[in-house]
Amino acid sequence: MVDIIKTNATFKAGKGNKGTLSFEIPAKQISSGIDQAFNKQKDKINIPGFRKGHVSKELFLARFGEEALYEDALNAILPDIYDQAVNEADITVVGQPQIIPDDLKHGGPWKIHAEVTLAPTVELGDYKGVEVEKESDEVSDKELNAELERLQKGEAELVPAKEDQVSEKGDTVVIDFDGSVDGKQFDGGKAQNFSLSLGSGQFIPGFEDQLVGHKAGDDVDVKVTFPKNYQAKNLAGKEAVFAVTIHELKKLETPALDNEFAKDVDDSVSSLEELKAKTKEKLAKDKAEKNKDAFEDAAIQKVVDGAKINPEKLPEEMINDDVSRQMQTFFNNLAGQGVKPEMYFQITGTSQEQLKQQMTEGAPNRVKTNLVLEEIARVEKINPSNEEIDKEIKSLASEYNIKESEVEKSVSAGMLSHDLKVQQAVELIVNSAQAVEKK
C-alpha cells in the first residue's frame, strides 16, 4: 500500500509567474532521511576505537549532534516530498526550485519554502482541420532537365582547352605563383604546378577573378589585399603582388545526353528514355516525401502560432532546459558516430559557444510547440497505454541496437509517456489537417 505523504502545501503567487511554495516534511520522512544521512556519513567518520563504518548511530549523535545529519537528510528526502507538495498545491512548475529551509527542528515537522517558477498557461486556437498549403508532388520538365544536367556534370571530365580558348569560372588552371609584400617574398606565398579551380574560393578574394580571361602560357601579375582578419597576422590587411604563370588550362567537357550516357550513369537502363522515366520516378518520390514533411511542419506551426501563451515571455528556466537537452542530444549523436566534440568543432571551425547560440535561437519556438502539444494531449485526454510504452521501448532498442533493459535504464517511463503523448498530439493535428493547393 502506497504511503500518502501530507505536506500541508500552500502556494503564494509572486510577481509574474514566480511564487512561493510552502510545505512541511512530516516526522516519519525526517526519521527516514536521518537514517539515510547517517548511513552515508558513517563510512567517512574517524572515531578513536572504532573502524570506519562501524560507529553506532547513538554514538554518532552523542558526539556530533543530530543537526550534523540535517543537510544530507534533507537532500535525501526532499525530491519526493517536493513533488508531493507541488501536486498538493495543484500547480505546474518549471526549472529547479530555490529551497529555503525555515525551521529544521528535532522531531519535525520541518518547514520549507521553495521559490518556484510556474509553467505558462496555454489557450489553444484551432488545432483540428487547419488548412495548410501543400506543394504539388508532380515533377515538371524543368526539374527533370535540371536533374539530368546534374547527372551530366557528374560525368564531366577535365580536358585541355583549345589554343584560342580563354579561362572562365569553373575552369581549372595549373599555375606557378610567387607572392611578395613590399617587394619581399613571404612564407607560404610560393608554389609550382598548383591546380586551381577558378571560382572555388581557395585563394583570398580577388586572386581567382584576375586569372579569368587568360590562356595557357600567359604570365599575370595578380594584385590583392589580404583580409584584415587573415590568420597570418604579419600579412593581415597588407597589399601583395603574385607573379603567376599559367601552364595549363582545362575545361569541363560534359557528355552528350544520349543512350550511351544513360547506360554509363545507370547500368540497369538501356536507353535515355528509360533513364528519364526512372529519374522522374525517383524525383517524384523524393518530392512527395519532402512535401509531406513540409506540410506536417506547417500544420504544427500554424497550430502553435494560433495558440496564446501566458506569460508571452517564456521563463528563462524553460529556455535553458531546452538548450541543455538539445546540446546533450547533439553530443550523444556525435558520440554515436564516434566523433568527439573537440574534433567536430575543429573540423567545422566552430565552437561550443557558437553551437549553444544556434540552439538558443530556436529554443523559444521549440518550447512553445511543446507547451501547445502538451495542452492538446491534456484536452484530448491522450494517455499512452503500457502496451504502447512497451512497444516504444522495443522500437528504441531495435533502432540503437541495444537491450530493452538498457533503454529502460536511460529513459524513464514518464519520459517515454510524455514523448508518446506529444507524438500522438502531432498525429492528431496532421491527420486532420486540410491540404490546399499552393498558389
UniProtKB/Swiss-Prot annotation:
Q: Which InterPro entries match?
A: PPIase_dom_sf, PPIase_FKBP_dom, Trig_fac, Trigger_fac_C, Trigger_fac_C_sf, Trigger_fac_ribosome-bd_bac, Trigger_fac_ribosome-bd_sf, Trigger_fact/SurA_dom_sf
Reaction catalysed by this enzyme: [protein]-peptidylproline (omega=180) = [protein]-peptidylproline (omega=0)
This protein's UniProt keywords: Cell cycle, Cell division, Chaperone, Cytoplasm, Isomerase, Rotamase
Q: What are its E.C. numbers?
A: 5.2.1.8
Instruction: Cite the GO molecular-function annotations of the record.
Output: peptidyl-prolyl cis-trans isomerase activity; protein folding chaperone; ribosome binding
Gene Ontology terms describing biological process: 'de novo' cotranslational protein folding; cell division; chaperone-mediated protein folding; protein transport; protein unfolding
Name where it's found.
Cytoplasm
**One Pfam entry name:** Trigger_C
The record's principal subcellular location, in a coarse class, is cytoplasm
Question: Which spans are transmembrane here?
Answer: none
Gene Ontology CC = cytoplasm
Which family does the entry's similarity section mention? Belongs to the FKBP-type PPIase family. Tig subfamily.
Q: What is known of its domains?
A: Consists of 3 domains; the N-terminus binds the ribosome, the middle domain has PPIase activity, while the C-terminus has intrinsic chaperone activity on its own.
Q: What is the designated name of this protein?
A: Trigger factor
> Source species, please?
Oenococcus oeni (strain ATCC BAA-331 / PSU-1)
Q: Which gene encodes it?
A: tig
